């Protein structure tokens, strides 16, 4: 998404993470007749927090802006039919373009955008990234279609996924591991050093047979390196406990800091809104910039 902003060549303004007051300042400063596109994620994959969708849409309507929402980490996992956070929060009909992926909840490869037919036709006609990309093979499309149909009608996976994520957070917190709070399925464990982060991931795999993705700069700012854990509906209590024991062993071997006061399994996990990341407001120079 950010690469698309860069490739467009459009003027851009960066608004502070989830700070809708700052977003309104930038929108108010733009000429009323200037085409504007607000670009944001619905669920932030590194911290697990969620964008204030309704407020963003309110501002878009007030200042004549379009909206582009990245639902890559939400489709299949949120909403009554798995359409994402926008569906869950009742904002799907207020967002102009929704971006999603087939590579996460749906277990395939590829991605998509959804919007009004005239807008999608414009992208088909003018976007070189689409025009010069080979189409997905029919077997992949068939597999993705089957996965989408299943998750549209089955809520078991979504409910179980959330329950498992909550269980992982509770067990890791009880072990005094530095879990970053969130109310989504993303479970970041703070390390704060790139070499230790990579070493922790390597030890987990080599010594315990557990693969956890290390997240280093430039994916996250320097000093906020972390392990990002994403449990599935099929990780049972025994596997969760094994993960906690493995992480405790790795933390001890690397001399990493633990939380001073462990939380128990029943302590509520609250949401923290990260103020580090920022996303662009892209102002189109002309309508045919698509």
Give residue ranges: language-model regions.
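Conserved PLP-dependent catalytic core of the aminotransferase class-I/II
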Residues: 51, 145-211
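PLP-dependent enzyme catalytic core of the Aspartate aminotransferase-like
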Residues: 207, 219-290
């Amino acid at each position: 998404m950010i690469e698309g902003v860069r490739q467009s060549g459009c003027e851009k303004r960066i608004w502070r993470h989830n700070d809708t007051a700052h977003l309104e300042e930038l929108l108010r400063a733009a000429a009323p007749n200037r085409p504007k596109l607000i670009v944001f994620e619905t669920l932030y994959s590194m911290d697990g927090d969620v964008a204030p969708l309704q407020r963003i849409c309110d501002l878009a309507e007030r200042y004549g802006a379009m909206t582009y929402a990245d639902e890559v980490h939400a489709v299949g996992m949120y909403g009554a039919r798995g359409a994402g956070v926008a569906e869950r929060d009742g904002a799907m009909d207020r967002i102009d373009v929704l971006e999603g992926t087939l590579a996460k909840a749906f277990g395939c490869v590829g991605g998509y955008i959804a919007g009004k037919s005239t807008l999608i036709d414009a992208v088909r006609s003018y976007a070189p990234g689409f025009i010069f990309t080979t189409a997905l093979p029919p077997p992949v499309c068939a597999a993705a279609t089957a996965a989408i149909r299943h998750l549209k009608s089955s809520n078991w996976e979504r409910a179980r996924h959330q329950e498992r994520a909550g269980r992982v957070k509770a067990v890791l917190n009880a072990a005094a591991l530095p879990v970053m709070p969130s109310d989504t399925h993303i479970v970041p464990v703070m390390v704060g050093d790139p070499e230790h982060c990579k070493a922790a991931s390597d030890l987990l795999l080599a010594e315990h047979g557990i693969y956890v993705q290390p997240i280093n700069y430039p994916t996250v700012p320097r000093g906020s390196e972390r392990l990002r854990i994403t449990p599935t509906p099929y990780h049972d209590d025994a596997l969760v406990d094994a993960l906690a024991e493995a992480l405790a062993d790795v933390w001890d071997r690397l001399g990493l800091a633990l939380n001073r006061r462990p939380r128990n399994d029943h302590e509520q996990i609250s949401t923290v809104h990260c103020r580090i990341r920022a996303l662009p407001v892209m102002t189109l120079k002309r309508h045919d910039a698509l």
